Amino acid sequence: MENSTTTISREELEELQEAFNKIDIDNSGYVSDYELQDLFKEASLPLPGYKVREIVEKILAVADNNKDSRISFEEFVSLMQELKSKDISKTFRKIINKREGITAIGGTSSISSEGTQHSYSEEEKVAFVNWINKALENDPDCKHLIPMNPNDDSLFKSLADGILLCKMINLSEPDTIDERAINKKKLTPFTISENLNLALNSASAIGCTVVNIGAQDLTEGKPHLVLGLLWQIIKVGLFADIEISRNEALIALLKEGEDLEELMRLSPEELLLQWVNYHLTNAGWPTISNFSHDIKDSRAYFHLLNQIAPKGDRDDGPAIAIDLTGFSEKNDLKRAEFMLQEADKLGCRQFVTPADVVSGNPKLNLAFVANLFNTYPGLHKPDNNDIDVNLLEGESKEERTFRNWMNSLGVNPYINHLYSDLADALVIFQLYEMIRVPVDWSHVNKPPYPALGGNMKKIENCNYAVELGKNKAKFSLVGIAGQDLNEGNSTLTLALVWQLMRRYTLNVLSDLGEGEKVNDAIIIEWVNQTLKSANKNTFISSFKDKSISTSLPVLDLIDAIAPNAVRQEMIKREDLSDEDKLNNAKYAISVARKIGARIYALPDDLVEVKPKMVMTVFACLMGKGLNKIK
């Protein structure tokens, strides 16, 4: 280690020892490289996931002195010194929950077969299996797979043909995948691979990070990757309605002196916490500040269940009586079991076992609470005429597409609300790096921001983001100032975000075309040439061409790139009603994803001929076509 490396104080050393002990679950004196990556995921680093992984890989080469893919405490300290010297560990949190029930498996890929270990949580596997079994128990397409046994590895085998994953994505975000595009019968390795591509590209389109997962990983059932993807998909569904514009009853959670805009900026996790505390306050019980330590004794849960259970006096069904006698049970595990028996009366015994409650598993307890909220929120929209209803307008489809695109790339923090979550420009900087615009991170103010002058720090970031856009990225940002980003001016923010997405899309094409700069005219020419070569009658004059509303140019292009991928009997070609156009568009988007095109656009974008999103569809298909030639 070079002498220029930052020294670590005795106080910091003690904190590191404490953190190390918490992830050294078997007290062996070592943690695996994968646990280290998990640790960084837990830390609030203003860097995207892929960047953290790169750093860890590079530094492991130095820190893992004996190359055993395990890190001792001494190696861990030298690793932290390296990170401190790179100005990355400033926001390192020492609160890492001790994780129990971790299964470690040896690496299986050719790269990791030299003895790396990946760990996965047995509890998560059991919880997800039970959730999927219940969710898909009546689906005829899943009869050969459901029910899965939570106590063996059947989950990893059952997901291998892609059908379950596609079904779970549609449960979380209905209509994401056109069922006609899923291969269901007489599956071959090729048609299974198509299903997995469809699942991965569709997961990406709903905001899941899939940058390091390939179809092969799912075929091989790599547990840590499968569980990571499943959790993201399940979470999208659990959190879908924990959003004020979609669920106005959440306005009831407004605290004294809090305005609606503050409430609307909260993440689903923060809203859930506020929801639990709203009911605990009504029950006269102390509030909680997390879904781990504070719920371990189950007592807060008893009160929550008692508050939200139907009383039979409204239109929420017959009364359900919650038995509180288990509340005074002395044994934590038994008390948790009594509590879950009461949750079962509400049809909500999901995600956690008594042991998961007592150990304070934050992920599974969050899922348990989200499911309770979705089933019995116990909220009623207040008759408050002071509420500005304009604030309750939900995000547009375009805004959601941009948000999902960013999240799928692994930006940190996760974007829940497009404008308020971009207010400090940290995610904008990460996107700049992804489009190869260099960011000088020493110019960037990082959280936590001070209470006084904190917003000024964010505006400085936004000013730098606009400056980079104009001078380095050569974007057209006329009339856009840093303050516009900070204040969430929708028109001006979208102008920047669109140019980021456009550049990202075109960079992929330039890489395939030996670096040749790609523009709209080149894409249109390639599309028409490819259609003509395949003897298709369709063509496009621009990305505003009205014929695109039928999706026929898109479907014909897919057929030209990947013959037999499109089933012609699924397409309506003449006398198209609005419903026919939408059906064609749904099928086109799903089949494009199935052949490997990572498309974020929605079927409506084709039907309504939204030129920006139409461009991304054709650009992604061109990328697929060029890749095939290579």
From Swiss-Prot:
Against Pfam families, the record matches this protein to:
CH, EF-hand_7
Q: What sections of the sequence does the record tag as coiled-coil?
A: none
Record's CDD domains? CH_PLS1_rpt1, CH_PLS1_rpt2, CH_PLS1_rpt3, CH_PLS1_rpt4, EFh
Q: Which molecular-function annotation in GO is an example for this chain? A: actin filament binding
As for PTM, the annotation reads: Phosphorylated.
A cellular component term from Gene Ontology for this protein is: cytoplasm
Residues covered by region (Actin-binding 2): 382-626
Q: Which residues form the EF-hand domain?
A: 11-46, 51-86
Q: Kindly indicate whether the keyword Calcium belongs to this entry.
A: yes
Sites binding Ca(2+) 3 sit at 64, 66, 68, 70, 75
Is this entry keyworded DNA damage? no
Q: Where in the cell is it found?
A: Cytoplasm; Cell projection, Stereocilium
Location (main, coarse): cytoplasm
Q: Which residues carry this modification: N-acetylmethionine?
A: 1
Which stretches make up the Calponin-homology (CH) domain?
122-238, 266-377, 396-505, 517-626
Binding-site positions, Ca(2+) 1: 24, 26, 28, 30, 35
| Region Actin-binding 1: start-end pairs | 108-381
Tell me, which GO biological process terms does this entry list?
actin filament bundle assembly; actin filament network formation; auditory receptor cell stereocilium organization; intestinal D-glucose absorption; positive regulation of multicellular organism growth; positive regulation of protein localization to plasma membrane; regulation of microvillus length; terminal web assembly
Q: Which UniProt keywords apply?
A: Acetylation, Actin-binding, Calcium, Cell projection, Cytoplasm, Metal-binding, Phosphoprotein, Repeat
Q: What does this protein do?
A: Actin-bundling protein. In the inner ear, it is required for stereocilia formation. Mediates liquid packing of actin filaments that is necessary for stereocilia to grow to their proper dimensions.
Q: How does it assemble?
A: Monomer.
What name is this protein filed under?
Answer: Plastin-1
**Phylogenetic classification of the source organism:** Eukaryota, Metazoa, Chordata, Craniata, Vertebrata
